[in-house]
Amino acid sequence: MAPTPSSSRSNQTQYTLIRTPQTKQRLNFHSKTPNPDGSKDPSPPEHPVEVIGRIRDYPDRKEKSPSILQVNTDNQTVRVRADVGYRDFTLDGVSFSEQEGLEEFYKKFIEERIKGVKVGNKCTIMMYGPTGAGKSHTMFGCGKEPGIVYRSLRDILGDSDQDGVTFVQVTVLEVYNEEIYDLLSTNSSNNLGIGWPKGASTKVRLEVMGKKAKNASFISGTEAGKISKEIVKVEKRRIVKSTLCNERSSRSHCIIILDVPTVGGRLMLVDMAGSENIDQAGQTGFEAKMQTAKINQGNIALKRVVESIANGDSHVPFRDSKLTMLLQDSFEDDKSKILMILCASPDPKEMHKTLCTLEYGAKAKCIVRGSHTPNKDKYGGDESASAVILGSRIAAMDEFIIKLQSEKKQKEKERNEAQKQLKKKEEEVAALRSLLTQREACATNEEEIKEKVNERTQLLKSELDKKLEECRRMAEEFVEMERRRMEERIVQQQEELEMMRRRLEEIEVEFRRSNGGSVDETSGFAKRLRSLYSDDDPGMVKSMDLDMGDPEPVKQVWGAVSHQSSNTISSNFTNLLQPKPSENMLTQMYPDRVCLSTVFEEEEVEEEEEKVIVEDKSICLITTPMPSLNSEGLGKENCFNGADDKESASSRRLRIQNIFTLCGNQRELSQHSGQEEDQANIASPDKKDNQFFSITNKAEALAVEEAKENNISVDQRENGQLDIYVKWETAADNPRKLITTLRVTKDATLADLRKLIEIYLGSDNQAFTFLKLGEPCGAQVAKEKESTVQATSLPLCNGHAYLATLRPGKSSQHKSLQPASPLPLNPIENMMEVTPISKVTPNHQVDEFSSPNLVAHLSSTPFITLRRH
């Protein structure tokens, strides 16, 4: 050992007192009998105590001081550096916690000792060191890193055979204030004497007899996990107190004894309380000082035992402490090995404690067992001792057998109870399974129902989609059909209008010729009518231009119609048409109140174009009752009045009035009046009458021919079918126009007729009711009675068709309060064909030009597009 430099006398004295003993100072146990084999050299001495150094890391501090410990490359020599020098200690191994965890430390130094215990050896592992050096942490570990206790149990029981032969018996003892307590058992009486420490009242105190604790309880098993959990739980019952040196300082020694009865092995794990200074620990009070004194007493007693054995003294003071009494077998048994783990701190503040710990370990390492030490088992020198040992083992085995039998009975009882509980649980499980089966069946049924419902839903959805597609297709076809029908109707109306224009031109030509003028000389009525429809603009706008282009006075002719009977037509017209000064010949022929007007459109100040439907004013045919004209020269040409031979003058006037109303040429009438005034003085009354009769006869012939073409008798129609005119009437005093003409079978009812009318109205359908038969202005027919009323019971119209009069329902009754107006009505009435209805005279005298086919095409008003300015 290198000399330590010293600057003071005190330092020399200190190092002299703690000098490590050398080999020459070791004392060997001499044999009482000489060696039988004296010729052979003695075997090398055996070291029963192995010392390992475990250096903990620094505490959790912000500033770490340099370490005072330094390990050589052989990992067996530790050098402690100080300001005045250094000192070396030789150990069997050194481990730093910063470099090696508990697992590496266990595999490197402890695992081989545990393997020896499994084959029957005895081993004692002691944790020695000052408080706060990490002894309990190395022994028991923590949650993340298990300690030596758990790893030892795992190695002993982990590789056991499948039969489960290997098991251990574990005893946990506590040495506190030089008293031994059993941590596995508790005292329920709780009548301990005064002065017992707090926390020890529930523990059982034991006595030492024959180097063992008498009546100590133990736990046995084959599972390392369960046993280690139990050990950790009872270890928490140790006396622990917080001091200035350690926040959780153990105030007692803990001894864990693991016996392996099958092989006779034993493992003793000793976690010693840390030696400490009373002043440094800050212990105050009698009890605290007694705890520290007793802890130091046990440590000092163990130190004396080690020194005595190392020095070879004849007397070893095992009885100085309860701890050394329990460890006596570990030091005296030849098969026992001691592993002493020295826990130290590298902190310079703990240098004095570190030196004391290393000196204690170096002293224990000097213990040797020489070759001359008698081996009682080997040579059989002491049979009595071996017999005692065998007897103790047999007794232990007997006790163990008895305990196993009692445990077996207890386990059988527990097994029976467990079987009963198992049967109950099985019954409950069976009931739950049956219930689960029922619910699964219900769930299956519900799933089947859901599947069926889904299938039905999909089927209905597909059918609905098909129906919707079919309805859409039918609607498109219906719209297309209506569009075509409207186009055909427009074309037909245009053709009829063209035909009427030609007829009117012919009438104009004939009229001019009859007056002695040429066709080319006059450009009045015919040219204006031709120019009216030759352009693309609507006719009504042209009529407005005609009225406002050349304003001339319009004369209203008022006259009286004679109600006296006459045998000839000429005498009748002679009395009716008396020429007056400054009056036109045509105005003389219209004594009724006639005023031809044009509907002017108001311009609205807006930003987009609108279509306004302008309806011509309905032509009201006003006739006065006339006596029948019995002329033999005229035939029955009127289809509505077969009794008269020739039309009256009033009927002819109304026919011409309708023609002029169609054209809307009010100014032309005044021009003709002016021209005829000039010719009134030249032509005689007889010549005027002849000319007038020639023109009216030709117009009458054309009208009769047209009426014969359009009016087809009922006999000429198809067998079994009827024609029905549908008329819309908002109120009794406000008659409207014909809607349409329907053809039905003879056995049809009003209900069938309603369906056809609703189909015709389409999306603009409006509630309506039929008026009672024969009473167009009377009460209404109930809807539920329509299926019982035949269509043949409707009144005849013009002798060849039936008339059905409709009236709006309750939702549209308020329209009856509105005055009759040619302005646009509701959407349904605007869609209807505009047909002027004439009031029928008592004699049913109707003009040929008022037939439905002609009037329907002449009275429709074209659309007029007004551009907003």
Curated annotation (Swiss-Prot):
Ranges of compositional bias, category Polar residues: 1-36
Enumerate the UniProt keywords alphabetically: ATP-binding, Coiled coil, Cytoplasm, Cytoskeleton, Microtubule, Motor protein, Nucleotide-binding
Annotated binding of ATP, by residue = G129, P130, T131, G132, A133, G134, K135, S136
Which ranges carry the Kinesin motor domain?
48-367
Localization (cell): Cytoplasm; Cytoplasm, Cytoskeleton, Phragmoplast
Family matches, as SMART domains? KISc
Extent of Basic and acidic residues compositional bias: 38-50
One of the GO BP terms on file: vesicle transport along microtubule
Which GO molecular function annotations are given, in alphabetical order?
ATP binding; microtubule binding; microtubule motor activity
Instruction: Please indicate which superkingdom the organism of origin belongs to.
Output: Eukaryota
Q: Where is this region: Disordered?
A: 1-50
InterPro entries to which the protein is assigned, alphabetical: Kinesin-like_fam, Kinesin_motor_dom, Kinesin_motor_dom_sf, P-loop_NTPase
Q: Name one GO cellular component term.
A: cytoplasm
Q: Which residues form a coiled coil?
A: 393-515
- Its chief place of residence is cytoplasm
Which PANTHER family does the record associate with it?
KINESIN-LIKE PROTEIN KIN-10A, KINESIN-RELATED
Q: Which family does it belong to?
A: Belongs to the TRAFAC class myosin-kinesin ATPase superfamily. Kinesin family. KIN-10 subfamily.
Assembly and partners? Binds microtubules.
Functional note: Probable plus end-directed motor protein that may contribute to the transport of Golgi-derived vesicles in the phragmoplast.
Q: What is this protein called?
A: Kinesin-like protein KIN-10A
